[in-house]
UniProtKB/Swiss-Prot annotation:
Protein name: Single-stranded DNA-binding protein 1
Lineage top rank: taxon: Bacteria
Subunit record text: Homotetramer.
InterPro entries on file: NA-bd_OB-fold, Primosome_PriB/ssb, ssDNA-bd
Example of a GO cellular component annotation carried by this entry: nucleoid
GO biological process, one term: DNA replication
MF GO annotations: single-stranded DNA binding
Organism: Clostridium acetobutylicum (strain ATCC 824 / DSM 792 / JCM 1419 / IAM 19013 / LMG 5710 / NBRC 13948 / NRRL B-527 / VKM B-1787 / 2291 / W)
Residue span, SSB domain: 1-104
Gene (name only): ssb1
HAMAP family the UniProt entry points to: SSB
């Protein structure tokens, strides 16, 4: 089973791109997810999780969500590889979002 559930704030506005070969829309964004444990200075730390969504979900995220919004994401963890311009193999770990829920804007949280 490969299932991820995250709640965090969008770190910047999402970016959407249409894939030329398929015509599918892909939207990428990153959310900051607070850790439950504080560091040695007593401060909260966060993990910055890259998320990719496709199709209608991608269109809705790009249209309605912005930096600072609190969102819930459910999906799966994916690791993919590619070769860079020097021929080196690179690995990318990301969440492929199947559902994204708008929870609140940054203004509502204040």
């Amino acid at each position: 089973m490969n299932k991820i559930l995250l709640i965090g704030r969008m770190t910047k506005n999402p970016s959407i791109k249409q894939i030329e070969t398929t015509g599918n829309n892909r939207c990428n964004f990153t959310i900051a997810v607070n850790r439950r444990v504080r560091n040695t200075n007593g401060e909260n730390e966060a993990d910055f999780i890259p998320v990719t969504v496709w199709g209608k979900t991608a269109e809705n995220v790009a249209r309605y969500m912005k930096k600072g919004y609190l969102v819930g994401v459910s999906g799966r963890l994916q690791v993919r590889t590619y070769q860079d311009v020097d021929g080196n193999r690179k690995y990318i770990t990301e969440v492929v979002g199947e559902e994204v829920q708008f929870l609140e804007t940054k203004k509502e949280a204040v």
